[in-house]
Amino acid sequence: MCSVLAIALVVALLGDMHPGVKSSTTSAVTSPSNTTVTSTTSISTSNNVTSAVTTTVQTSTSSASTSVIATTQKEGHLYTVNCEASYSHDQVSLNATCKVILLNNTKNPDILSVTCYARTDCKGPFTQVGYLSAFPPDNEGKLHLSYNATAQELLISGLRPQETTEYTCSFFSWGRHHNATWDLFTYPIYAVYGTRLNATTMRVRVLLQEHEHCLLNGSSLYHPNSTVHLHQGNQLIPPWNISNVTYNGQRLREFVFYLNGTYTVVRLHVQIAGRSFTTTYVFIKSDPLFEDRLLAYGVLAFLVFMVIILLYVTYMLARRRDWSYKRLEEPVEEKKHPVPYFKQW
């Protein structure tokens, strides 16, 4: 009994000397039956947004325990997101790809949810057009969202809007929240045509038309800084020729490129004064200018063929006629008959 009292006295003295257990921040008084652990996570994202999450967990034990208030730092995966619109040749469907790019050598970030918003007026509010989550409900909205965890890409598809639209998608992962914005310009891209000149050279014509939208801040297509470049690998190819053309009664700006090889998809970097965007354009139809020339060449070849046939027929008729005239003009030799003999009686 005395030994037990002595041990209790020593424990009490030690408790007075160490009033708490030091963690990363503070400590609390012990509780005989309950344990309360409060964890506060402070996260700083790449866009300077700091969030704090406080979690309180209560457990019951049959023995004495210690309540600790600890602050921990959860390290999230550093990444950025680049989104790019994609046009089809008929411009009916909307396709876009958001690529997640890691900034550190950690494993791929676990994207928990993606929410996309859109607006057509620069001053109007954004409305939700798509939602994708690792937990049900899944994929709700006007756009179809699908995430490829292996390629770390978000694929967005739907009907093409009738006017230029701003999009923003929020990516949520463990300890991270990142916003990515991109624009779908219904104009000024009027058309993109590709023509294979020979086995090694291809000509690409990009036609742009004037487009007034709040995103362009009043910038004009005919501004000296307005231009188009083609992406070929890691290089930006400038246009070989820039001119103003009229097509179907519309005034257009034409950019001509010459590429080595044959392509059905080109990536365009369009810059209108201070505003720029990159888009992937798929062209399947051949250049109508080339088709017009081909038709003209075909008609010319047909006319030449008909002239040759006409000359040949004329020559044959003339030759036959000359042969007939020759037969008529040939002297007819009279056949000599003997002098008739009359018998005299």
Curated annotation (Swiss-Prot):
Residue ranges constituting the Ig-like V-type domain according to the UniProt record: 91-190
Region Disordered: start-end pairs: 23-42
Stated name of the protein: Viral Fc-gamma receptor-like protein UL119
Record's GO cellular component terms: membrane; virion membrane
Positions of glycan attachment: N34, N48, N95, N104, N148, N179, N198, N217, N225, N241, N244, N260
Range of residues in the leader sequence: 1-23
Swiss-Prot/TrEMBL keywords: Glycoprotein, Host-virus interaction, Immunoglobulin domain, Membrane, Modulation of host immunity by viral IgG Fc receptor-like protein, Signal, Transmembrane, Transmembrane helix, Viral immunoevasion, Virion
Disulfide-bond pairs as recorded: none
Domain of life of the source: Viruses
